[in-house]
Amino acid sequence: MYCWGSGRIGHGSPLSDIKTPKPLYFNISNSEQVNIFSEEEETEVKGEKDIEFIDFCAGRAHSLAIDNKNRCWVFGENSSAEFGNNSLVYSKVPILNKQFENEKIVSVSCWNQSYAITDQGKVWEWGKSIDTLIPRLLKFQYPIKAIDCSLNNSIGVSHNGIAFIGFNFNNEPKPVDYFIENNIEIQSVACGVNHYLYLTNRGEVYSNGGGISTGHYDEFYNNNNNNNNNNNNNNNNNNNNNNNNNNEIKEKVVEKVVEEEEGEEQFNIIIPKKLKQLRNIIEISSGYYNSLALDGYQNQVYGWGENLNGQLGIEGIDYSTEPILIELPLVEIKHISSGAYHSAFVTNNGELIVMGGGLVVSDDIRMSVALGNGEGGFQTIQFKVDTTKDETIISENIKFNKPTSQLINFEIKDKNENNETKHTNKNKDNHDDDDESDHSDDDHHDDDDNDKDSQGINDKGILTEEEMLEFQYHFNELSHYDGARNQFSPQFIQSLKKNKIVIDKVSCGKFHTLATPSKIQLIAPIESLQQYCIKYISENIINNMETDTSFPDINTLPINTVLKIDSHLTLNRNHSDRSQRLMSYLKSSFKQNINNNNNNNNSTTVNSPKSTKYEWDQYLENYSKEFEANAIVTLNNIEILTKTKGFEISLETINAIINGFIEFSQYIEQTSTQVANSENENENEIEMKMKMKKNEMKMKMKMK
């Protein structure tokens, strides 16, 4: 299991700041040691790192994992009994929860609170939402197969397809009657801070609750405005008035308006409503204020709700009031997860894509902590930093004595060290309602300026004037914005790709992420000619683009190719300012052409509205099938294919290998054997012919 992020994330330190996915070690003897709870030096981490896990979950500040022996491992924060082990002391490394030694745990879920499900469908609960240090057994009417939870919110689904809500804070589970009354079977569930998601066995998605994360925002306000207009304009007709009043009453049963403290209107959907835009959905996930749905037919993801921190992976919008496609045309997605403010996808090839992050507002210097890694990761989570004290404030007024980044050590920094700084996101509100006092930590800044010079640093004079100017430059708002643009877009975790680690499943918490490798290491697929063309064009754009008007021929590319080039540059984090502008221009030009022509043509090129539709298959028709096959083989640098005498490879074979129908190594072995046999047969034939010729010569000599 890999874990990275910030906080108490099981790597042996009281606080960690891990930017690259790092293996966790699991050791049973850790549960017996006392020093693992020490606030002092780091604990030496020993144990197994290749344990197989059947389920795991990253919570708000702690994590749970179930191994293949059905043992429950816990690590992280434990100030609110998150461990369920009759203790309030945290652990720097994973330890076993011995409360379940007599139970066979098969599934877990956690956030502030924790849940464990047994093989019999029994549910154990413990943590912040209840007044107990050890797990308590919940009373469900039916055996439960899955539970999801968020900040002070929980939802479950039984094996027979009944959804349950309202079982946090010592409350008893309540079935959602709407689905029972309408004979709708629920397959899986998810929840955020204020909303619920339900996935049916027919691939449809329902939602209820409050906010734009339900996906019904536009529908609600359109209906509300229409009802008000009808009530104002139909006073002359009693029948119409009655009808309108009935409609209004009906709406109130389904949707309810709530007045917030600021006087703003907010809606709350009482009865679950179907999201009509979504079909063929196979998985759902929810962040605090956003939602995700995986389309099993397209292998693509839809997202809606809040996008202030890039958790939807869509650049240029703060919110989406309805489900919209997160365009990733180069990959096929098989698994999704959404944390508080960031999300992660796993592709069919086992690649991990991560996006988003949390942003905490601070009037002081902002310290950024990466959720990913330097190459293909990003630096988005930001904590408040008190520059007069050697401590970091991370939510709920909790002060940690150990800093988690060299940025807050600048007062005692060695003069010989390089002044490394990090780009951070533009300063925005993150509505971090989960930590009720995240935005009220100003008590620690009253005396910040007492011992500082005009540059903002105390009189120790560690930084030179030049270094200070550079420091200030890297932390101005313009730099924040420029450095953060790519961070709102989905990105590969490059360290996993480089090490050929195939990911099977991922779970996003608040400040950290967990991921497990696949039990079956996939064979790297042969890259198609299309993929090589995409990479070739992308590299040329980055390496040879001197001005914004470079590459005039790119305007003739089909829009699907443009989208794939943009996706390649984005996922691999290769975009430059010019390439981003070029891609934005090409995409907007295509949309403008479509609008100008009123959809009366079939153009799929960027600036050629009258041209015919181009697809990759049509491009390749200009060449023979042998050309495509040879091009793929050559570009993949498969030496054995080009050097083996008599070896032939067809387009059908290439397609079969690419699609996984034929295992490449097996094909090579069989073909090589056939070629070798063929060569042996040829040698035998030649020897026989030579012998025959010799005999003929001898006979002729005798006759003479």
Swiss-Prot record:
Q: Where are the RCC1 repeats?
A: 1-48, 69-120, 298-348
The highest taxon in the source lineage is: Eukaryota
Q: Does the record carry Repeat as a key word?
A: yes
Reply yes or no: does the keyword Repeat apply: yes
Q: Where is the composition biased (Acidic residues)?
A: 432-451
Region called Disordered, residue ranges: 221-246, 412-458
Give UniProt keywords alphabetically: Coiled coil, Repeat
Q: Give start-end positions of Basic and acidic residues composition bias.
A: 412-431
- Residue ranges of coiled coil: 668-698
Listed Low complexity bias regions: 222-246
**Secretion signal span:** none
Which InterPro entries is this protein grouped with? RCC1/BLIP-II (IPR009091), Reg_chr_condens (IPR000408), Ub_ligase/GEF_domain (IPR051210)
The record ties this protein, via PANTHER family, to:
OS09G0560450 PROTEIN (PTHR22870:SF408), REGULATOR OF CHROMOSOME CONDENSATION (PTHR22870)
What is the protein name for this chain? RCC1 domain-containing protein DDB_G0295713
Native source species? Dictyostelium discoideum (Social amoeba)
